[in-house]
Amino acid sequence: MARYLEVSDIVQQWRNERPDLDVEPMLVIGTLSRVSLLIDRALDKVFSKYKLSAREFDILATLRRRGAPYAISPSQIVNALMINNSTLTSRLDRLEQAGWLRRMPIEGDRRSVNIQLTDEGFALINRVVEEHVENERDILSPFSEEEKTHLRALLGRVEKHLVNNR
């Protein structure tokens, strides 16, 4: 089995090849990128059991956490998930075909619809979210509560910086 190339090894290769370039940011960003990829893979283990993608889970979860009647507009989903309309449309089509949500016409506006969980979608997301939370708990198990709080604060600062400067 090939040795896993650590981010620090990659950065050292850059230092060797480009000693004139300060590649220090690569240590943090490279690690964040790797961790993000590994987290996505770990989360997908739960989603794939239910034949869901991460985005499809996010759509169902967005509807579920809004409370009864578990219906919102497509634009609210787009804003909540930071995705574009074309991505949303294909995901909604698949979730609707699976019977987990439906498009509900809005009275007085023939062009607009709300997206609503079906009873089957409600039952599904309730099952999946329980496993999802346990999976997330396992992913974060190396950290103490204090470390998780600190990590969240640090990542929150990066998130805020990126949102404010895009």
Curated annotation (Swiss-Prot):
Keyword Transcription (UniProt): yes
Knockout consequences: Mutants display derepressed synthesis of both pectinases and cellulases. They also produce an insoluble extracellular blue pigment, indigoidine. The survival of the mutant, in which indigoidine synthesis is derepressed, is significantly higher under oxidative stress. Mutant is much more aggressive than the wild-type strain on potted S.ionantha.
InterPro entries on file: HTH_MarR-typ, Tscrpt_reg_MarR-type_CS, WH-like_DNA-bd_sf, WH_DNA-bd_sf
Keywords: Cytoplasm, DNA-binding, Repressor, Transcription, Transcription regulation
PROSITE patterns: HTH_MARR_1, HTH_MARR_2
GO MF term list: cis-regulatory region sequence-specific DNA binding; DNA-binding transcription factor activity
Listed SUPFAM superfamilies: Winged helix' DNA-binding domain
Predominant location: cytoplasm
Highest rank taxon of the organism: Bacteria
One GO biological process term: regulation of DNA-templated transcription
Gene Ontology CC, one term: cytoplasm
Function according to Swiss-Prot or TrEMBL: Negatively regulates the expression of genes encoding pectinase and cellulase, which play a major role in virulence, and the expression of the blue pigment indigoidine, which is implicated in pathogenicity and protection from oxidative stress. Represses the expression of genes involved in indigoidine biosynthesis by binding to indA and indC promoter regions. Also binds to promoter sites in the pecS-pecM intergenic region and negatively autoregulates its expression as well as that of pecM.
PANTHER family, alphabetized: TRANSCRIPTIONAL REGULATOR, MARR, TRANSCRIPTIONAL REPRESSOR OF EMRAB OPERON
Protein name in UniProt: HTH-type transcriptional regulator PecS
Organism: Dickeya dadantii (strain 3937)
Gene: pecS
